[in-house]
Swiss-Prot record:
Catalyzed chemical reaction(s): ATP-independent breakage of single-stranded DNA, followed by passage and rejoining
Subcellular compartments: Nucleus
Location of the active site: 334 (o-(5'-phospho-dna)-tyrosine intermediate)
Gene: top-3A
Assembly description: Component of the BTR double Holliday Junction dissolution complex composed of at least him-6, top-3, rmh-1 and rmif-2, which is involved in double strand break repair in the germline. May interact with rmh-1.
Protein name per the record: DNA topoisomerase 3
Entry function: Component of the BTR double Holliday Junction dissolution complex, which is involved in homologous recombination during meiotic double strand break in the germline. Releases the supercoiling and torsional tension of DNA introduced during the DNA replication and transcription by transiently cleaving and rejoining one strand of the DNA duplex. Introduces a single-strand break via transesterification at a target site in duplex DNA.
Zinc finger GRF-type: from-to: 716-759
Organism: Caenorhabditis elegans
Region (Disordered): 609-715
Biased composition (Pro residues): 640-649
Length: 759
């Protein structure tokens, strides 16, 4: 009888696979690690009875490390970290699992990898293969592809085994090696320099604060600091607007100005006076049209994380940890997916049928079955996993706390997705007073549709009284409203994930990990309301590299790497090609950064000085570390961190220009004939320069009359422009006597345009 070893990524998955393939009769025994059991069973594999042992690892077993001669921070050359040899070794905490795999590999003929079907899962599978093959070179290696722990999915995977995707493994190895080299070099550079300059703050021994760098975490930090600075530098600007209020049928209706708002009070006063002269409002148009509120698209990882943050008040990391637990226990499908459209061949009706048992949403599930299962699909597919959806029914008392909250979210989202849009009727009333146009809208809900189950969104009636097209009325009140422009809000974790997804920083599977890392390193803090604020250390790091002329906190460099990794996965580029290219870019920046490193300490000193004067700022430390699975990135943060940020200190405006003339630096080859010469101009020349945040407009000054040597020919904005007429402000006030241009048509004309310009 053949003997096969199945190895899953987690013990819960191993347990589920064994239970399904044995119909619940598998035997359990202990492995070397108490957390990773061994399950034994007999079943058919490749058309013949096979004795199978099922065990597991706990995420990544191995990582890239430098040799011992590069481990001393004081003596090893930092720039050599870009070309020094590295090795792929089993980490100390995984030694017991390694021992189990070696022992089991010797006793089996076939190895089947049952890790998660994503990039990291493929790389973990390659680590399992390496350990097992070192023990038994004769092993025949296969890979099972599945997206859920169900009988159908596991049985299908066991009958359709494939080989590991070596291109995907190469992409992960490329990223891991780059993270080690880049993170180690910049972490040592900035930590040693800042420790030396700020001994009291950071200490000087091996347990002191590590100022770590990661090529994904730094752009993530950059998004937070950019928003913080945008808010701090925001200049509020006053504005004015016209409002028409009218009461009918006991409803007070506010008609909004079609111009929205203007930033010049005098202009608004003039337009207000013109409207007052008319003394009546004319209903130009009353239109009714169907209005729909679309049900949500099928659920992918990014949307699950964002919903977990905004609706469940959980962090992205917590949401994904719970989702993975639910997946391992067979409650939901694989939660790390970029797909938001269900494949045509997937029968969703049985999944809806299961949920009819619920005393919470069972009636809605029955309604979905009566109307027909009709998923709203997006356009994305990773060609590996379906959207996240429930696999089996459970009740609230069977899941506790966050487990239930995430399960409920997945179920409600799924039922909403496969149901019907909410339907209503919108009424739009267009009003004219003098030369100015206004509008009001109402909404009457006719069918709540998906909103009956999707409690995370609201859509309410907004009733309007009856208006008749062409009618006129005088019992209205014309007002001038005022306000000030508001700064954007601080980012939430959901906002940050959206930006990371938009600019290609990390993947859907790693966004939460990167955010947790900059929290742990205390580069950002989280306010009680969930808003993210940089610490002054985070601000100083970003400013320091900006002042050197390197946009390290911008997404370009890392996004470019993510593109390279995808090209490796697709077979369009080789691992070594991408590795050499990225090492060349970052090494060029490192050489210049090392030369200008004093700028970094100057940046931190400015914030320290400002903090001492102002007594700190609104931020606070974060908490929680990232899970072992996924990318590294240059070391971990220390247990404590500097205070939160003050307002950014005053410093010369603008950034020093990037220097295109710099010493040529070589890549990491030992053979000088094969070295690629890379200059800083080449590093940044291939990507668009990041645009600085737009400076807010200064408040506009009141317009003044123009002195003209000859009469200006001015035309209005009618479809067929006519020469504008000149009028004079008659109202008492600072603008009395000023001339302005307006449309030549009479105020009573419906064709008169809204043109206005000071003369």
């Amino acid at each position: 009888m053949k003997r096969a070893l199945f190895v899953a990524e987690k013990n819960d998955v191993a347990k589920g696979v064994a239970a399904i393939l044995s119909n619940g009769t598998a035997n359990r025994r202990e492995g070397r690690s108490k957390f990773n059991k061994i399950y034994t069973l007999n079943t058919e594999l490749f058309g013949q009875q096979t004795a199978i042992s099922v065990t597991s690892v706990s995420g990544h077993m191995m990582n890239f490390q430098f040799h011992e001669n590069m481990s001393n921070w004081q003596t090893a050359s930092m720039v050599e970290l870009f070309r020094a040899p590295v090795r792929h070794v089993v980490t100390p905490e995984m030694k017991l699992i390694e021992q189990t795999l070696r022992e089991q590999a010797q006793r089996h003929d076939i190895l089947v990898v049952w890790t998660d079907c994503d990039r990291e899962g493929e790389a973990i599978g390659a680590e399992i293969v390496k350990v097992c093959r070192d023990s038994n070179r004769r092993l025949d290696i296969f890979r099972a592809r599945f997206s859920e722990i169900t009988k159908a999915a596991i049985t299908r995977a066991a009958r359709n085994l494939i080989r590991l995707d070596e291109k995907t493994v190469a992409a992960v190895d490329c990223r891991s090696e780059l993270d080690l080299r880049i993170g180690s070099a910049f972490t040592r550079l900035q930590t040693l320099h800042l420790r030396n300059r700020f001994r009291d703050l950071l200490g000087q021994n091996d347990t002191s604060q590590v100022i770590s760098y990661g090529s994904c975490q730094f752009p993530t930090l950059g998004f937070v600091t950019d928003r913080y600075k945008m808010i701090e530098n925001f200049v509020s600007e006053p504005f004015w607007k016209l409002i028409v209020e009218h009461t009918r049928e006991s409803h007070k209706v506010e008609f909004l100005w079609d111009r929205n708002r203007l930033f010049d009070r005098d202009t608004v006063d003039i337009l207000h006076d013109e409207c007052k002269e008319t003394k009546e409002a004319h209903v130009e148009k009353v239109a009714k049209k169907p209005k729909s509120k679309w049900r949500p698209q099928a659920l992918d990882t990014v949307e699950l994380e964002k919903l977990g943050i905004s609706k469940l008040r959980m962090s992205a990391k917590q949401t994904m940890q719970v989702a993975e637990k639910l997946y391992s226990k067979g409650f939901i499908s694989y939660p790390r997916t970029e797909t938001n459209k269900f494949p045509a061949g997937l029968n969703l009706t049985p999944l809806v049928q299961q949920q009819t048992q619920s005393n919470i949403w069972g009636d809605f599930a029955n309604e979905v079955l009566q109307n027909g299962v009709n998923p709203r699909n997006g356009r994305k597919s990773d060609e590996a996993h379906p959207p996240i959806h429930p696999l089996k029914f459970t009740e609230k008392h069977q899941l506790q706390g966050d487990d239930w909250k995430v399960y409920e979210l997945v179920v409600r989202h799924f039922l909403a997705c496969v149901s019907q849009d909410a339907q209503g009727e919108e009424t739009m009333v267009n009003l004219t007073v003098g030369t100015e146009k206004f509008h009001a809208s109402g909404l009457r809900i006719r069918d709540m549709g998906y909103l009956k189950v999707y409690v995370y969104e609201k859509w309410g009636n907004r009733l309007l009284p009856t208006y008749t097209e062409g009618e006129r009325f005088t019992d209205f009140e014309l007002k001038i409203g005022d306000g000030k422009t508001q700064a954007p809000d601080f980012l939430t974790e959901a906002d940050l994930i959206s930006l990371m997804d938009k600019y290609g920083i990390g993947t859907d599977a790693t966004h939460a990990e990167h955010i947790e890392k900059i929290k742990t390193r205390e580069y950002i803090g989280v306010r009680p309301d969930g808003k993210l604020i940089p610490s002054f250390l985070g601000l100083a790091l970003v400013d320091g590299y900006d002042d050197m002329g390197f946009a390290m906190s911008k997404p370009d460099l890392r996004a470019n790497l993510e593109i390279g990794l995808k090209e490796i996965c697709d077979g369009r580029r080789q691992k070594q090609e991408v590795l050499d290219e990225q090492i060349g870019k970052y090494r060029a920046i490192f050489v210049e950064s090392e030369r200008k490193i004093g700028v970094l300490s100057q940046s931190l000193q400015r914030y320290l000085d400002k903090n001492n004067q102002a007594g700190g700022g609104p931020g606070g430390p974060g908490g929680g570390g990232g899970p072992p699975r996924g990318p590294g990135g240059g070391g971990g943060g220390g247990p404590t961190g500097p205070p939160a940020p003050p307002k950014p200190p005053a410093k010369p405006r603008g950034r020093p220009p990037r220097k295109s003339i710099s010493p040529a630096v070589k890549n990491g080859h030992d053979d000088p004939e094969n070295d690629t010469i890379v200059t800083l101009s080449e590093v940044f020349g291939s990507m668009s320069n990041p645009k600085p945040a737009r400076k807010p407009r200064a408040p506009r000054k009141s317009a003044a009359p123009k002195e003209q040597e000859e009469e200006e020919e001015v035309f209005c904005q009618c479809p067929e422009p006519m020469r504008a007429v000149t009028k004079v402000v008659q109202k008492e006030g600072p603008n009395k006597g000023k001339k302005f241009y307006t449309c030549s048509l009479p105020y009573t004309s419906s064709e008169k345009c809204n043109f206005f310009k000071w003369a």
